[in-house]
Amino acid sequence: CCEWWKWWWKRGGRDPVGRAFLPKDERCFVIEKNGVPVACYFLFIMEPHIVGWTTYLVSNPEYKEKDRREIIKTLVTSVEKEAEKIGIMQLFTICGNKQMTSIHESLDWMLIPVQNEGFKYLTNNFIKK
């Protein structure tokens, strides 16, 4: 996934998300077709386990088959099912483009347009090397 991020994120002039900002491995989901990784998606779980946040969906830029959308849709559905098994009652996500918005809408997500979204790194909490 890291190489995919480098490819996608360089288009926006940003560095990809660091591993420290991702959930534990058991909350990192990868979907493959015929042994070729197509996309990955991440699930953060809030305490108590009522709300989950799915994020950082990234796809293999070299996978250009026509079934790409359906494979990504299957990945989103699979993460929904895993969240449901854990007891999550609501999932939250932010769709960064038309394709992801369309996929989530087709899966009955309620999407609300957001004018601005933001984040801030609290760098005083970073380990200094």
PLM-predicted stretches and their roles:
Residues 5-34, 38-59:
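A conserved beta-strand-loop-helix scaffold within acyl/acetyltransferase catalytic domains
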Residues 12-16, 82, 86, 129:
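Solvent-exposed amphipathic alpha-helical surface segments
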Residues 38, 102-103, 123-125:
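Short, solvent-exposed polar/charged micro-motifs at secondary-structure junctions
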